[in-house]
């Protein structure tokens, strides 16, 4: 009986924390001074007046971010290599899951996907600076080339495509968002899902983020566990 009571107390404290987290997120939303930026594709393109960014850090022109992350044939050293798990987490355009067991998916993994995939990651044949990236084994950006990607993928998010390293160009200033409204929406939904899983605001705020990215609304009737799985995917 004592163990049962202790477990109940722990559960109540956990629920109180989720409730407090939801309220904190809702308080930020209700300020009414932030709004989702219209285009995910240009969300991270150094707009210092971005309506979505709540807290950000600025870096000057000497960051060399492009030099350290461009694909190797473009003068970079491919520093950040996104993982296959990250690539696979992006849904299909219709909201279904991507699967390597689907023959069409496997042949063209970058086609008919959530637009945020191609806005975030340079896959094989992605067009960068008007030419196709060659991430395949034997390609100019593929395995075996010095400093080439180790995963088959390069970072695209935050990179300034106008920088030309090969002609002596350097980096430009960068903005790193530490908190943005999309995260607050999903924090709110996640916390609500834990202590009030029937609350209609859960789907409402997740779908706002999905809609901005061009993804369909979540199917209705998702269980609490299913929603736990779908909320993180909506943030990618």
Listing of model-derived features with the role each one plays in the protein:
Residues 5-74, 78, 84, 98-235:
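Acidic/polar-rich alpha-helix caps and helix-coil junctions
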């Amino acid at each position: 009986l004592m163990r049962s009571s202790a477990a109940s107390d722990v559960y109540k404290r956990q629920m109180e924390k989720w409730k407090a987290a939801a309220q904190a997120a809702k308080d930020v939303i209700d300020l009414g001074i932030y709004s989702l930026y219209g285009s995910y594709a240009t969300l991270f393109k150094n707009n210092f007046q971005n309506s979505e960014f709540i807290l950000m850090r600025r870096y000057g022109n000497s960051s060399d971010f492009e030099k350290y992350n461009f694909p190797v044939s473009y003068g970079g050293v491919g520093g950040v290599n996104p993982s296959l798990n990250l690539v696979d987490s992006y849904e299909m355009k219709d909201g279904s899951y991507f699967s390597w067991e689907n023959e069409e998916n496997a042949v063209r993994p970058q086609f008919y996907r959530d637009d945020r995939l191609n806005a975030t990651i340079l896959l094989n044949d992605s067009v960068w600076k008007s030419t196709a990236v060659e991430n395949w084994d034997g390609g100019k950006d593929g395995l075996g080339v010095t400093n080439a990607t180790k995963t088959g993928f390069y970072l695209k998010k935050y990179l300034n495509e106008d920088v030309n390293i090969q002609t002596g160009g350097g980096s430009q200033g960068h903005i790193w968002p530490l908190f943005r409204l999309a995260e607050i929406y999903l924090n709110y939904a996640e916390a609500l899902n834990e202590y009030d899983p029937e609350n209609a605001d859960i789907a409402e705020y997740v779908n706002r983020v999905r809609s901005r990215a061009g993804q369909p609304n979540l199917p209705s009737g998702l269980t609490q566990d299913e929603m736990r799985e779908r909320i993180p995917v909506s943030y990618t």
